[in-house]
From Swiss-Prot:
Essential cofactor(s): FMN
Pfam families xref list: FAD_binding_2 (PF00890)
Claim: Flavoprotein is one of the keywords in the record: yes
Record key words, sorted: Flavoprotein, FMN, Oxidoreductase
Protein name listed in UniProt: Anaerobic glycerol-3-phosphate dehydrogenase subunit B
Keyword Flavoprotein: yes
Enzyme type, top EC level: oxidoreductase
GO BP annotations listed: glycerol catabolic process
Reactions performed catalytically: a quinone + sn-glycerol 3-phosphate = dihydroxyacetone phosphate + a quinol
Family: Belongs to the anaerobic G-3-P dehydrogenase subunit B family.
Pathway connected to this protein: Polyol metabolism; glycerol degradation via glycerol kinase pathway; glycerone phosphate from sn-glycerol 3-phosphate (anaerobic route): step 1/1
A GO MF term: glycerol-3-phosphate dehydrogenase (quinone) activity
Subunit structure of this chain's protein: Composed of a catalytic GlpA/B dimer and of membrane bound GlpC.
Species whose genome carries this gene: Histophilus somni (strain 129Pt)
Length: 432
């Protein structure tokens, strides 16, 4: 098989890059091994939430200079402020076209309510999630009802309510909790392993008398002005939840549950469907194993399902994710990228070849290994033994030099690098 571009990884970075390339007339294939991190995500995307010194960030433009000073190896610092802002704006335009149902702007972060009742700075959020402006002194409603589902332990209304009321923006609120019984779920309640958001959503969409669900939500909501629900209403898209909102006449909001996250699943499905609609190929259930590199170029790769006959392409994109997705792995004496074994980078706290530096003593502290990843140049090209591989690029969390969890920038790095890679591939092919 031969394509213009082969992308390893079907997450946010891989799909974003693939969509942009398909729009420019390139023939792309995505090698997708299992679920992406989007299926476990909150439904929100971060551009930059805080600096390495712990300072919270209201806007990327405000925080960039300090980021460049404190962490010059961050991928953003390779591109420059204006390039990152341009790509963030471009991504917003892309997802508006796809109708991803998100709110927010690269110009300023906003708060989203977390499932545990926290307030998290973020860039873009699904429009079904409760959010508020950073400068709002009070949440927009005074009476909030948090509804759980009887027997469902992946969403805890009481815990959310007790934590939420601690924030100054919610001290004026009256927050009550209640449980929905939903008799149609009794079969799932018999097996706790099956009582998960995906299973609940499937049953509610296909077996439930919709009117009874509407009435139970209205009754349990009492005099609540804003109703917070676990994200269990609508598996493939937001239509079922939107219909619930319309029929109840209430201000309904969804909060992501413990994985799998339906909000993230919906976003991933929309991106994937759009990529395929543009003519892209997805090789599901396959895994890239090794590559043939000659004259500083990748000639072909072999996968689990294509071990005898390689997959050829003009350009290759590594968007396989970090340790969570097995895009990076560890052996006893070093951290490495397993397919191409390219050069790695971390931050000042870690030595890639000294495992004693990989972790911090406190479990809750930022872990140094999370900053490890592949080293790139300003074109997102990779290096092997110090030599640039001309047709191999990286996008997303496989890139090192920063801690996405600590800084709140994982999604931002994914889309900025993905769009940068797409531009560079198009430019390279136009030169030929």
């Amino acid at each position: 098989m031969k394509f213009d571009v082969v992308i390893i990884g079907g997450g946010l970075a891989g799909l974003t890059c693939g969509i942009m390339l398909q729009q420019k007339g390139k023939c792309c294939a995505i090698i997708n091994n299992g679920q992406s991190a989007m299926n476990f995500s909150s439904g929100s995307m971060d551009l930059l939430s805080q600096l390495p010194n712990g300072e919270k960030i209201n806007s990327f433009e405000q925080g960039y200079d300090s980021l460049e000073e404190q962490l010059p190896n961050h991928p953003y610092c390779l591109f420059g402020k204006q390039h990152v802002l341009q790509k963030a704006k471009q991504f917003e335009q892309l997802i508006e076209k796809i109708n991803l149902n998100v709110t927010g702007s690269y110009k300023q972060n906003h708060f989203r309510v977390t499932p545990l009742g926290g307030l998290h700075r973020t860039w873009l959020s699904a429009d079904c999630i409760p959010t508020m402006d950073l400068h709002d002194e009070h949440f927009g409603y005074q009476k909030i009802t948090v509804l759980g589902i009887e027997g469902y332990h992946d969403f805890q209304p009481h815990l959310l309510a007790e934590n939420l009321i601690q924030h100054p923006q919610f001290t004026h609120c009256s927050i009550t909790t209640a449980l929905l019984h939903l008799p149609e779920l009794d079969q799932l309640r018999l097996t706790s392993r099956e009582f998960r958001s995906v299973n609940i959503s499937q049953l509610l969409e296909h077996r439930l008398a919709f009117r009874e669900l509407v009435q139970e939500i209205k009754q349990a909501s009492g005099d609540g002005e804003a109703i917070f629900l676990p994200a269990c209403f609508g598996l493939d898209n937001q239509d079922f939840f939107n219909k619930l909102t319309l029929e109840t006449g209430l201000n309904l909001y969804e909060l992501p549950t413990l994985p799998p996250s339906l909000v993230g699943l919906r976003q991933h499905k929309k991106l994937k469907t759009y990529f395929e609609k543009l003519g892209g190929f997805i090789l599901n259930g396959d895994k890239a194993l090794r590559a043939v590199i000659e004259d500083q170029q990748v000639k072909q790769i072999y996968t689990q399902l294509h071990q005898e006959h390689g997959i050829f392409a003009e350009h290759f994109v590594l968007a396989s994710g970090s340790f969570f997705s097995n895009g990076l792995v560890s052996v006893f004496d070093r951290l490495l990228e397993p397919i191409f074994d390219v050069d790695m980078i971390g931050n000042s706290m870690i030595d890639i070849q000294n495992r004693l530096t990989w972790t911090a003593r406190r479990f809750s502290s930022p872990q140094p290994y999370q900053s490890a990843g592949v080293a790139i140049n300003s074109c997102c090209q990779l290096k092997k033994s110090g030599q640039i591989i001309k047709n191999l690029y990286a996008a997303g969390n496989v890139i090192g030099g920063y801690n996405a969890l600590e800084l709140g920038c994982g999604s931002g790095v994914a889309v900025v690098t993905a769009l940068t890679v797409a531009d560079n591939i198009i430019e390279a092919q136009n030169r030929v």
